[in-house]
């Protein structure tokens, strides 16, 4: 098993970054970020969808530890959208809920960029 990237941050900073990116992915269905961050977000996002597919109260509480309470429009927050909109899409799928598409390097520092989105 590969060692996850530390993204040059302390543990608290890295966890906060991943929470923000996963929440943004749930709200917008697609985000643009660096390749390293996209790979880290993919692991967490797939785990959140798997929890949401279970649909239990315990799964909802576990997902609430990671997903921030931000407005996702339509009178729902990100956690509600995860459980009521995103999870039902993947009832027949056992994994691989997201894809990473590489894009052109970022202007300025030439960092490799990628788009991560729900399939």
Swiss-Prot record:
GO terms for molecular function: structural constituent of ribosome. One of its GO terms (biological process) is translation. One of its GO terms (cellular component) is cytosolic large ribosomal subunit. PROSITE patterns: RIBOSOMAL_L17 (PS01167). Keywords: Ribonucleoprotein, Ribosomal protein. InterPro entries: Ribosomal_bL17, Ribosomal_bL17_CS, Ribosomal_bL17_sf. Coiled coil: none annotated. Part of the 50S ribosomal subunit. Contacts protein L32. HAMAP family: Ribosomal_bL17 (MF_01368). Belongs to the bacterial ribosomal protein bL17 family. This is Large ribosomal subunit protein bL17. It comes from Acholeplasma laidlawii (strain PG-8A).
């Amino acid at each position: 098993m590969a060692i996850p990237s530390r993204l040059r941050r302390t543990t608290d900073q890295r966890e906060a970054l991943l929470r923000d990116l996963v929440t943004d992915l749930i709200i917008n269905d697609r985000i643009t970020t660096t390749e390293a961050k996209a790979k880290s977000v993919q692991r967490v996002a797939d785990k959140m969808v798997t929890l949401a597919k279970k649909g239990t109260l315990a799964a909802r509480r576990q997902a609430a530890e990671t997903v921030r309470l931000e407005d996702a429009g339509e009178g729902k927050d990100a956690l509600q959208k995860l459980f009521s909109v995103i999870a039902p899409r993947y009832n027949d799928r056992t994994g691989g809920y997201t894809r990473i598409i590489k894009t052109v390097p970022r202007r300025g520092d030439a960092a490799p960029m990628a788009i991560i989105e729900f399939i």
